[in-house]
């Protein structure tokens, strides 16, 4: 089968950059963001308003429980997916009512940061303006429970997709205990690919065995010709795995050929790729699991497992395609001056004669100076399609948004990536991996052109 060339006009070194993805889940640090600042929680008493609260006709059983069931309990239910805080009962919700109101009003919760007017996405658990107002009013009125005998019907909670079968299960080569002396431990582990024939990965589900310390995982696919480079990195460190940040390590040549295979963040479920498409893996390849452990969750060990749905019959071409300006990666052109607000930079890529592909999802990545970011297509006919826009960037909540309808790109279209930052520090910033550095990156799952409805 023919393989379309990558639309990227630059070397693929930028594939090795960090992206804290929530595949289709709740993201990281759920409990912290729900409850708000500890001082705020203490001031509020950690619960419903005291005397003098305004009155309301809204109650938990009649009005609020359906909202929570659909948009909150995927993370904050009795068996929530990584949020850590159970808000499935009127008693628990009332206990946290005022912090909940603050988080909902500020749009920190639920952690759905895609702009409402950009596009439509699968599994949208965001709150409408009307539902936000209801939650805030109910909380500030003392979080009344209402009558359970006349409770409204509860819609099902959003749950991430699951693999319909698992053809291959891989795990870290050893159980690893992160260094408790540092809050963040980035560690890469080389994992053998056991199949002796061409294969196409059509779905992934990454499952850390200790979610209390696992912050995120990125799986990189290393082609056979570059395996020796990563084996040398692994052998050079006496401890399990080897240290890494921003990618799997490797030299500039190997970073041009490695690809992304999957990613995970707390609350995330399986990534199921579009029907008839898959990521090709050649015999002799290896995987690198980049683990980001956060030891603030307590001590402990982890041995992350990766479930894969795999086809041995050829699938339609697909790639996890990053977008950024290679000049930024090389330290040119993405200057963010000290003590300056509203600094924006933009990257454009014009689709050439051979570029015909479809976007199926999109994710954006910046660091903590980020204010807003967007990815859109300016079509040759003058129309424009927004893929993803995040107007209030939150470093703690980064996820991949799966488009309800794929967006086709044809020759002459332009893909436009734009990022804006506020640099409140006394140091100039530019592209880099440190906490005082910044990035502007988008990643997308692309395939051959997709039939339009």
Language model regions located:
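Acidic glycine-/aspartate-rich tracts in secreted/extracellular proteins
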Residues: 78-81, 115, 142
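Short sequence/structural segments immediately N-terminal
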Residues: 56-73, 80-82, 92-95
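Sec-dependent bacterial lipoprotein signal peptides
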Residues: 1-24
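Beta-strand-centric surfaces of beta-sandwich/beta-rich domains
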Residues: 84, 114-121, 149-358, 363-453
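Ser/Thr-rich, Pro/Gly/Ala-heavy low-complexity intrinsically disordered linkers and tails
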Residues: 23-57
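Extracytoplasmic electron-transfer domains, predominantly the class I c-type cytochrome c fold
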Residues: 91-139
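The canonical Cys-X-X-Cys-His
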Residues: 67-79, 87, 109, 135, ...
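Non-transmembrane alpha-helical segments in soluble domains
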Residues: 65, 69, 73, 101, ...
């Amino acid at each position: 089968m023919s393989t379309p060339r990558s639309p990227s006009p630059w070397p693929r070194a930028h594939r090795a950059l960090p992206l804290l993805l929530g595949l289709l889940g709740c993201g990281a640090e759920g409990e912290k963001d729900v409850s708000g600042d500890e001082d705020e929680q203490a001031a509020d008493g950690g619960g419903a308003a005291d005397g003098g609260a305004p009155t309301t006709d809204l109650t938990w059983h009649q009005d609020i429980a359906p909202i929570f069931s659909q948009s909150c309990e995927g993370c904050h239910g009795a068996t929530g997916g990584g949020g850590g805080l159970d808000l499935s009962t009127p008693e628990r919700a009332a206990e946290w009512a005022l912090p909940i109101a603050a988080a909902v009003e500020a749009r920190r919760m639920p952690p759905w940061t895609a702009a409402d007017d950009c596009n439509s996405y699968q599994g949208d658990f965001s709150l409408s303006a009307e539902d936000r107002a209801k939650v805030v009013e109910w909380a500030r009125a003392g979080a009344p429970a209402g009558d359970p005998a006349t409770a409204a019907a509860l819609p099902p909670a959003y749950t991430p997709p699951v693999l319909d079968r698992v053809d291959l299960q891989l795990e870290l080569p050893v159980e690893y205990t992160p260094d408790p002396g540092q809050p963040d431990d980035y560690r890469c582990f080389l994992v053998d690919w056991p199949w002796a024939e061409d294969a196409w990965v059509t779905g992934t589900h990454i499952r850390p065995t200790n979610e209390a310390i696992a912050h995120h995982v990125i799986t990189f696919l290393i082609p056979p010709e570059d395996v020796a480079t990563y084996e040398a990195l692994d052998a050079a460190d006496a401890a399990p795995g080897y240290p890494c940040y921003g990618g799997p390590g490797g030299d500039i040549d190997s970073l041009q050929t490695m690809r992304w295979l999957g990613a995970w963040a707390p609350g995330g479920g399986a990534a199921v790729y579009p029907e008839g498409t898959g990521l090709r893996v050649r015999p002799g390849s290896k995987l690198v699991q980049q683990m980001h452990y956060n030891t603030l969750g307590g001590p402990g060990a982890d041995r992350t497992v990766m479930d894969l749905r795999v086809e041995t019959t050829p699938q339609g071409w697909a790639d996890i395609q990053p977008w950024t300006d290679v000049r930024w990666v090389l330290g040119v052109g993405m200057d963010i001056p000290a003590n300056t607000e509203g600094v924006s930079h933009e990257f454009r890529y014009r689709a050439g004669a051979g570029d015909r592909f479809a976007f199926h999802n999109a994710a954006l990545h910046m660091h903590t100076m980020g204010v807003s970011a967007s990815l859109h297509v300016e079509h040759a006919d003058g129309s424009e399609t927004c893929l993803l826009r995040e107007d209030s960037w939150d470093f703690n909540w980064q996820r991949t948004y799966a488009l309800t309808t794929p967006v086709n790109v044809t020759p002459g279209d332009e893909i436009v990536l734009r990022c804006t930052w506020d640099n409140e520090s006394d140091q100039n910033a530019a592209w880099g991996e440190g906490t005082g550095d910044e990035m502007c990156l988008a990643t997308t799952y692309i395939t051959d052109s997709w039939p339009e409805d």
